[in-house]
């Protein structure tokens, strides 16, 4: 079995690592957006033996781990975790912020000097880590291996894929509004064939043909508020989060981008991660590779709803099962 180092980076209050002896072949860094440390205890009974419980059982759990800054938006959060410093030094102070040198508000990863690789809105691909002022752990890995170790970042959010991967990444991939993965010319001249093939298979269709139904009896979600209550908003600003949710109808009406606000946004990202490991030959030589994955569907659901609602817990619970499956797949590799 190849040496795989699987680390879970909880944005932004905790860090857990599944440790192995010796130099790892592959490091997999995972951020779960809006996954607070307290959820490990709060939802512990929901965990299977191959997911979080395995990480807790075989790894380390650091409970007193803080970055002294605010606000904890996606971009400064991911940047702080991967650079090990605060926005004052790495420069990413928000998702959007006013840049005095340019006298305008900018987006954290926008870059007019690059172009999209892949389908969709060209502006969605004008992205790079050029505004990040500090090196990341992934950058330091590239430097320590004389650029021989591969680094790939991925997420359904552009900033969550680009910033963790750092300046020297081989690739970063993120999802466009049509449910397909894209990149930019910062990383290469054309999208890798395996990513084109992945997009052409339209995995999102098989996921969106399912009704989103709770995996457990609603009565078992006793630590959360009930379904259909006045405190919840709408998923993607238009979908009532009352279960079961007919995702296929929403897909037909509004396109595949709806997958971002479901647990299957995380599923399709895990599928892409396994495709990257296979097609990029990650972990196949003596140089440590790094795969930075940021699961963001929990963030979309958390913003639309609330942490105390059972809809959010359902999303977390579904993701826990996906983590277990992903962990098993990694171990087999």
Regions found by a protein language model. Name each.
Residues 86, 94-286, 296-303:
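His/Asp/Glu-rich, glycine-adjacent segments
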Residues 318-333:
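Metal-dependent active-site segment of extracytoplasmic phospho-/sulfohydrolases and closely related
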Residues 1-23:
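Bacterial Sec-dependent N-terminal signal peptides
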Residues 36-42, 65-67, 122-129, 256-263, ...:
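Second-shell loop/turn segments in exported
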Residues 23-28, 58-62, 89, 146-151, ...:
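Loop/turn elements at helix/coil->beta-strand transitions in domains of secreted/extracellular proteins
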Residues 301, 308, 324-325:
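Terminal, contiguous helix-loop blocks that mediate binding/assembly
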Residues 40-89, 150-154:
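Short, structured active-site-proximal loop/turn typified by the sulfatase FGly-forming signature C/S-X-P-X-R
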């Amino acid at each position: 079995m190849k040496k795989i180092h699987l680390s879970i980076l909880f944005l932004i209050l905790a860090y857990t690592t599944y440790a192995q002896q010796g130099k790892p072949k592959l490091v997999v860094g995972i951020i779960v957006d809006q996954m607070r440390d307290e959820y490990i205890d709060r939802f512990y009974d929901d965990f299977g033996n191959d997911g979080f419980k395995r990480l807790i059982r075989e790894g380390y759990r650091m409970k007193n781990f803080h970055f002294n800054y605010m606000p904890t938006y996606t971009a400064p959060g991911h940047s702080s975790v991967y650079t090990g410093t605060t926005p004052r030094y790495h420069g990413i102070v928000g998702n959007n912020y006013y840049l005095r040198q340019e006298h305008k508000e900018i987006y954290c990863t926008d870059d007019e000097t690059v172009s999209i690789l892949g389908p969709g809105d060209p502006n969605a691909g004008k992205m790079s880590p050029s505004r990040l002022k500090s090196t990341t752990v992934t950058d330091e890995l590239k430097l320590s291996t004389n650029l021989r170790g591969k680094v790939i970042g991925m997420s359904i959010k552009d900033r969550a894929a680009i910033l963790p991967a750092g300046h020297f990444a081989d690739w970063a991939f993120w999802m466009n509004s049509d449910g397909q993965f894209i990149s930019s010319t910062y990383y290469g001249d054309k999208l890798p064939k395996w990513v084109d093939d992945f997009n052409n298979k339209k995995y999102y269709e098989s996921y969106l043909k399912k009704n989103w139904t709770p995996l457990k009896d609603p009565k078992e979600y006793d630590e959360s508020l009930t379904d259909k209550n006045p405190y919840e908003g709408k998923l993607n600003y238009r979908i009532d989060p009352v279960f079961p949710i007919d995702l296929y109808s929403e897909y037909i009406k509004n396109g595949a981008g709806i997958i971002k606000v479901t647990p299957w946004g995380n599923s399709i990202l895990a599928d892409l991660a396994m495709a990257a490991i296979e097609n990029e030959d990650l972990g196949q030589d003596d140089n440590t590779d790094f795969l930075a994955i940021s699961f963001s569907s929990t963030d979309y659901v958390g913003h639309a709803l609330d942490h105390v609602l059972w809809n959010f817990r359902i999303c977390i619970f579904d993701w826990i099962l996906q983590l277990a499956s992903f962990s098993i797949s990694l171990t087999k590799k």
